[in-house]
Regions:
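Catalytic histidine-centered segment of alpha/beta-hydrolase-like enzymes
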Residues: 129-142
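Short beta-strand immediately N-terminal to the catalytic nucleophile in serine-hydrolase-like folds
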Residues: 40-45, 69
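Gly/Ala-rich beta-loop-alpha elbow adjacent to hydrolase catalytic centers
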Residues: 45-53
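Catalytic histidine neighborhood in serine/cysteine hydrolases
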Residues: 116-132
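A conserved short beta-strand
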Residues: 62-74
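Short beta-strand/loop motif that positions the catalytic acidic residue
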Residues: 90-91, 96-98, 102
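Serine-hydrolase catalytic machinery in alpha/beta-hydrolase-like enzymes
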Residues: 1-40
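Acidic catalytic loop of the alpha/beta-hydrolase fold
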Residues: 100-105, 131-132
Length: 152
């Protein structure tokens, strides 16, 4: 999905509550289009998109799982500004796929905060990758996400 602020051509994102509402609305619409319930689907996204999906699920969006690509644990250089307040309410299986050189969260930082997540968690590190993984790891990402979803 495309967030409304992007569709409107704005660079600055809306506040989290509006983004979460957009995800919930689109998830429900998509499930309806498929003739199923949202809890039969996995949701996710890259960076802020994944974070907002995880927040929507933590706030009650039914889901089978969440896939988080390049999760922004904190702003670069600001590890004290963690984006994990919703982790204890995240009770679905979660997959994190991050670069091991991502300035938005190191492997050690993510490992420290993952135990706060209520549901089962898998983590896959993309060796030598930063926040924007290079296309040469696309097949690796597809394989990891596919294996995770197949195991649900």
């Amino acid at each position: 999905m495309e967030f409304p602020y992007r569709a409107e051509g704005r660079k600055a994102p809306d506040r989290a509550p509006k983004l979460i509402a957009s995800v919930i609305k689109e998830a429900e619409r998509y499930a309806g289009d498929l003739g199923c319930e949202p809890d039969e689907l996995a949701f996710g996204g890259r960076s802020m998109g994944g974070r907002i999906c995880s927040m929507a699920i933590a706030e009650g969006l039914p889901a089978a799982a969440v896939v988080l690509l390049s999760y922004p644990l904190h702003p670069p250089g600001k590890p004290e500004r963690l984006r994990i307040e919703h982790f204890p309410a995240l009770a679905v299986p979660s997959l994190f796929v991050n670069g091991d050189r991502d300035p938005f969260g190191t492997p050690a930082e993510l490992a420290e905060h993952i135990p706060a997540i209520a549901g089962p968690v898998e983590v896959h590190w993309l060796e030598g990758q930063r926040h924007d993984p290079k296309p040469d790891v696309d097949d690796e990402i597809i394989e990891v996400v596919g294996r995770f979803l197949s195991g649900l």
